[in-house]
Amino acid sequence: MLEQVQKFLLSRAACQGSDSQSRYEELFHKLDVNKDGKVDILELQEGLKAMGMEVGKGAEEKIVAAGDTNKDGHLDFGEFIRYLEEHEKKMKIAFTSLDKNKDGKIESAEIMNSLKVLGIKISLDHADKILKSMDSDGTLTVDWNEWRDHFLFNPADNIQQIIRYWKHSTVLDIGDSLTIPDEFTEEEKKTGQWWKQLMAGGMAGAVSRTGTAPLDRLKVMMQVHGSKGNSNIITGLKQMVKEGGIRSLWRGNGVNVIKIAPETAMKFWAYEQYKKLFTSESGKLGTAERFVAGSLAGATAQTSIYPMEVLKTRLAVGRTGQYSGMFDCAKKIMQKEGIRAFYKGYIPNILGIIPYAGIDLAIYETLKNYWLQNHAKDSANPGVLVLLGCGTASSTCGQLASYPLALIRTRMQAQASIEGAPQLNMGGLFRKIVAKEGFLGLYRGIGPNFLKVLPAVSISYVVYEKMKVQLGI
């Protein structure tokens, strides 16, 4: 992909030990078309295009944003050199992490094994394709010079792109918090990119949940007040507006957004701790171990913030004027029902993690690996439609499997607030719902829940991409 740039760089190296700065200096003067001592985005785009270099979408903007220390929209010679030197250090870390046998060369097997550790399985043929795209001398191995020159103007290397493009739970937020946490590479941990990605994901989740809050509240209302005559989505929305006005459609959304930060932080911390227990002697964490560690991390995070889940449900089903806010709701629950009320529905909630997370992970990994095996050619980027499609499909299947438990959890959280309602346990509620409404009653409210999936993942993806630019990811 970068053959002409590689030839340009290599042909101007006086010898193998040639100083990097002299090569970068000559490259700068070639890109500086108008000879004003600065390189802007347009010059970078045209210069790289003229050299036959195909970079990812928005790569030029990211390069200028990352290197432009004085924020004048250009890269002067000093900024240009500093950016490439810093980028070269990052590329060296990535190269070293892939070169498992420390022979100074990367082979197809090392590419396969490195991706396998992260749950990405590719064939030997696909690994060969990745390697050949970097192999300029036809040796079927990639040394440091080939690696450096291939990724000189890519904000990320190809292996990192495969991992980053296919991150799932960090990028897509559909309102449920039962997904397995994403893996962060050693480079992302060392450079601090991990917390920026979590922050971007948190902001994406907040905007996504707020945008789909009316459908989420309608789902809760249909779960709690389920009946065969109360299943029309439009009618349900009209009733909520009639009872409390337009603002009532967002009742309970504040708690739903606030809990993102502590839950994400706890899940990430717990996942890192559980991974240490399940990592093999070779340092590898397989898909099965990742599922167990991720499920335990999800259970730990849910346990820590579960009272907020109860508050969200109570606020959502509450009447207008019943609670003045989150703290008033918590105070009234404590006074009337005691502290145990904040963990009503906890058992079905924890049990729901296993089918949701397991099926979501299995289907997403299957779809991801199928695309990588059959459709990935020169780029690791699957495109927005493929990403959203895979995320939507896996999440939908996970929801179908765990929805009955989610419905029972919501009923248990809310039943004490309904006058005259008996306080049933999980088994009692299950039998009552099946006897009164049939097995379809266990899926009451799934209509608005499915309706919000596509807009939720779309909103979260767009916001996540915008936040990545703002945070310099």
UniProtKB/Swiss-Prot annotation:
Domain comment quoted from the record: The regulatory N-terminal domain/NTD formed of two pairs of fused calcium-binding EF-hands, binds calcium in the mitochondrial intermembrane space and regulates the antiporter activity of the transmembrane domain/TMD. In absence of calcium, the apo form of the N-terminal domain is intrinsically disordered and binds to the transmembrane domain, inhibiting the transporter activity. Binding of calcium leads to a major conformational change and abolishes the interaction with the transmembrane domain and the inhibition of the transporter activity.
Signal sequence bounds: none
Gene3D superfamilies hit by this protein: EF-hand, Mitochondrial carrier domain
GO biological process: adenine nucleotide transport; ADP transport; ATP transport; cellular response to calcium ion; mitochondrial ATP transmembrane transport
Record field: catalytic activity: Mg(2+)(out) + phosphate(in) + ATP(out) = Mg(2+)(in) + phosphate(out) + ATP(in); ADP(out) + phosphate(in) + H(+)(out) = ADP(in) + phosphate(out) + H(+)(in); AMP(out) + phosphate(in) = AMP(in) + phosphate(out); phosphate(in) + ATP(out) + 2 H(+)(out) = phosphate(out) + ATP(in) + 2 H(+)(in)
UniProt key word Transmembrane: yes
UniProt binding sites for Ca(2+) 1: 32, 34, 36, 38, 43
Subcellular localization: Mitochondrion inner membrane
Chain spans, region Linker region: 159-168
Quaternary state and interactors: Monomer.
Positions with a binding annotation for Ca(2+) 4: 135, 137, 139, 141, 146
Family: Belongs to the mitochondrial carrier (TC 2.A.29) family.
A single GO molecular function term of this UniProt record: ATP:phosphate antiporter activity
Chain ranges on the Mitochondrial intermembrane side, renumbered to this chain: 1-197, 272-294, 365-387, 465-473
Regions of this protein lying in the Mitochondrial matrix compartment: 216-251, 309-344, 406-444
Gene Ontology CC terms: membrane; mitochondrial inner membrane; mitochondrion
Function: Electroneutral antiporter that mediates the transport of adenyl nucleotides through the inner mitochondrial membrane. Originally identified as an ATP-magnesium/inorganic phosphate antiporter, it also acts as a broad specificity adenyl nucleotide antiporter. By regulating the mitochondrial matrix adenyl nucleotide pool could adapt to changing cellular energetic demands and indirectly regulate adenyl nucleotide-dependent metabolic pathways.
Binding site for Ca(2+) 2: 68, 70, 72, 74, 79
Residues holding Ca(2+) 3: 99, 101, 103, 105, 110
Ranges: Solcar repeats: 192-277, 285-370, 382-470
Membrane topology value: Multi-pass membrane protein
SUPFAM superfamilies: EF-hand, Mitochondrial carrier
Regulation: Activated by an increase in cytosolic calcium levels that induce a conformational change of the N-terminal regulatory domain, uncapping the channel and allowing transport. Inhibited by bathophenanthroline, mersalyl, p-hydroxymercuribenzoate, bromcresol purple and tannic acid.
Transmembrane stretches, start-end: 198-215, 252-271, 295-308, 345-364, 388-405, 445-464
Native source organism of the sequence: Xenopus laevis
Region annotation C-terminal transmembrane transporter domain: where it falls in the sequence: 174-473
UniProt protein name: Mitochondrial adenyl nucleotide antiporter SLC25A24-B
